[in-house]
C-alpha cells in the first residue's frame, strides 16, 4: 500500500492544528487597526518563509519525496491557506474596512514574497547546499 496519502493527511492535520493555535494566540487589534486578521497574516508570512527555505532544500534533493509530501504538501498546506486570506479580506471589505483590507492584502503578498526569498537565500547560503 502506498502511504503517501497518509503522510500528506498527517502533515495536514499537524499544519491545520498549528494554524488554529496561532490564530487563537494573535490579538484582533493590531497597530492602528481595530480589527485585523493578524493570525492568518502571520501564518501566511511564516509559511511563505518556511516554504522558501524548504523549497530550496527540496530542489537540491536534501530530503526524500515522502518527507516533502509530509512537510511541504501536508504541514505547510494545512498551516498556510490563502482561502482563509481571501475570506478575511472579503469580511473586512463587507464591513467597509477598506484601509484594513488593502493593508492586509498588500502586506500579506509583499511580506510573503519577501519571506520566500529570505528563506531560499538562507537555505542556499547558510545551510551550505548550493
Curated annotation (Swiss-Prot):
It is a multi-pass membrane protein. It is found in: Cell inner membrane. It catalyses: fluoride(in) = fluoride(out). GO terms for cellular component: plasma membrane. One of its GO terms (molecular function) is fluoride channel activity. Keywords: Cell inner membrane, Cell membrane, Ion channel, Ion transport, Membrane, Metal-binding, Sodium, Transmembrane, Transmembrane helix, Transport. Na(+) binds at residues 77, 80. Na(+) is not transported, but it plays an essential structural role and its presence is essential for fluoride channel function. GO terms for biological process: cellular detoxification of fluoride. Fluoride-specific ion channel. Important for reducing fluoride concentration in the cell, thus reducing its toxicity. Belongs to the fluoride channel Fluc/FEX (TC 1.A.43) family. PANTHER family: FLUORIDE EXPORT PROTEIN 1-RELATED, FLUORIDE-SPECIFIC ION CHANNEL FLUC. This is Fluoride-specific ion channel FluC.
Amino acid at each position: 500500500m502506498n502511504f503517501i496519502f497518509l503522510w500528506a493527511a498527517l502533515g495536514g492535520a499537524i499544519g491545520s492544528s498549528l494554524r488554529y493555535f496561532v490564530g487563537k494566540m494573535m490579538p484582533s487589534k493590531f497597530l492602528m487597526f481595530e480589527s485585523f486578521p493578524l493570525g492568518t497574516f502571520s501564518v501566511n508570512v511564516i509559511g511563505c518563509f518556511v516554504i522558501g527555505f524548504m523549497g530550496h532544500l527540496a530542489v537540491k534533493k536534501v530530503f526524500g519525496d515522502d518527507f516533502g509530501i509530509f512537510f511541504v504538501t501536508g504541514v505547510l498546506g494545512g498551516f498556510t491557506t490563502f482561502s482563509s486570506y481571501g475570506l478575511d479580506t472579503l469580511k473586512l471589505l463587507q464591513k467597509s474596512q477598506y484601509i484594513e483590507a488593502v493593508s492586509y492584502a498588500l502586506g500579506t503578498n509583499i511580506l510573503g514574497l519577501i519571506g520566500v526569498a529570505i528563506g531560499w537565500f538562507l537555505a542556499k547560503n547558510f545551510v551550505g547546499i548550493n
